[in-house]
Amino acid sequence: MGNNVVVLGTQWGDEGKGKIVDLLTEDAKYVVRYQGGHNAGHTLVIDGQKTVLHLIPSGILRNNVKCIIGNGVVLSPEALIKEMSGLEERGVPVRERLFISEACPLILPYHVALDQAREAARGKKAIGTTGRGIGPAYEDKVARRGLRVGDLFDMASFAEKLQEVMAFHNFQLEHFYKVEPVSYEAVLEQAKGYAELLTSMVIDVTNELDAARKRGDKIMFEGAQGTLLDIDHGTYPYVTSSNTTAGGVAAGSGFGPRHLGYILGIAKAYCTRVGAGPFPTELFDEVGDHLGTKGHEFGATTGRKRRCGWFDAVAMRRAIQINSVTGFCLTKLDVLDGLKEIKICTGYQMPDGSIAEVSPMAADAFENVTPIFETMPGWSETTFGAKTLAELPQTALDYIKRIEELTGVPVDIISTGPDRNETIIKVHPFSA
């Protein structure tokens, strides 16, 4: 039985993880975020009501679930408080359900200023970050100058550390990027305002999760972004600044890796990508427009239009290798309704004429790659809202089976709409 389940994206993010986490948390006691920051955008639709979460784990709407923000997450106090307020206005008792690791690095206003100044300076070579300070906060963590949630317990010491790090970053902002420096006094006053709230939510996350495991409590680890955006294994440099893969779970939460059970890979029935970077199966025709319009492909965090393309089994094989995926959840199957034919990328023809069955890693290696497609018949029937396999047309079942054959991994869950009830569960991860 998979008591400890990891839910992560196997593409370039935006795969529909939030809905699936919310659905599966009916059986969980804990939901843990282990990487990323408020650059994530997890959309939940419950009985028609839409909720978008950026930082708080997607289990927060369940009254039986403890939600934890692990040490691998870079935490923006401003974003957290805004998100908490929105939920509390709707009657969600966030403070009773949400807990934070004291080792979470803080995202502060100078990180945001740096992020935006750098993207502007890159011009046409911009990476396409969300501009929310995620990358600079991770840089400070690795450089060992970052401030953490635990530093807020001693504000005198915090003020000294803040002054030192801001002198360093303001020098860059003024003299290299030629923009206004960030006010030290303003940042310090801001920090004094939220220190009590954040420190009141701190727990020993490793100890809490280990005790939960020993009790047999079900724990879910919620990934943000997607495998192909991983800082180490993604299409570098067009990646995020954290480990979005299964390997990030242990490092970003302090939970022992040997105790992880089922790895659920979330994948759209087609592919999307936000921002710059390689995308071999990208469509520039009316089919791409159809996917974008019908799939409402606009980022939950940035509002940016997503690039759309066919399902890429080559990139998926790389994601499976990295994450040791147990089973897939295939989302947005209904977006393919009405297409006469559907294509799957089964290989890449490389510039030297060789055929790659697993995608390269660095972005440069994707240059002049030609996708090799297999064409399958589409279906005219609607799959929207289907709750059983019997409701799916045979051609849709054939498409799902072909994905299983090409990847070697079973599709255990199929999502046919945004609501948590619009789902077909063949194998439940907590029962696998």
Swiss-Prot record:
This protein's species is: Vibrio cholerae serotype O1 (strain ATCC 39541 / Classical Ogawa 395 / O395)
GO annotation, biological process:
'de novo' AMP biosynthetic process; IMP metabolic process
Q: How is the cofactor bound?
A: Binds 1 Mg(2+) ion per subunit.
Known partners and oligomeric status: Homodimer.
Which taxonomic lineage does the organism of this UniProt entry have? Bacteria, Pseudomonadati, Pseudomonadota, Gammaproteobacteria, Vibrionales
Q: Which residues carry out catalysis?
A: D14, H42
Please list the GO terms describing molecular function.
Answer: adenylosuccinate synthase activity; GTP binding; magnesium ion binding
Q: Does the keyword Ligase apply?
A: yes
- CC cofactor: Mg(2+)
**Protein task:** Plays an important role in the de novo pathway of purine nucleotide biosynthesis. Catalyzes the first committed step in the biosynthesis of AMP from IMP.
Q: What class of enzyme is it?
A: ligase
Q: Which PROSITE patterns match?
A: ADENYLOSUCCIN_SYN_1 (PS01266), ADENYLOSUCCIN_SYN_2 (PS00513)
Q: Gene name on record?
A: purA
Task: State the protein's name.
Answer: Adenylosuccinate synthetase
Pathways involved? Purine metabolism; AMP biosynthesis via de novo pathway; AMP from IMP: step 1/2
Report the EC code(s) recorded for this entry.
Answer: 6.3.4.4
Top-level taxon: Bacteria
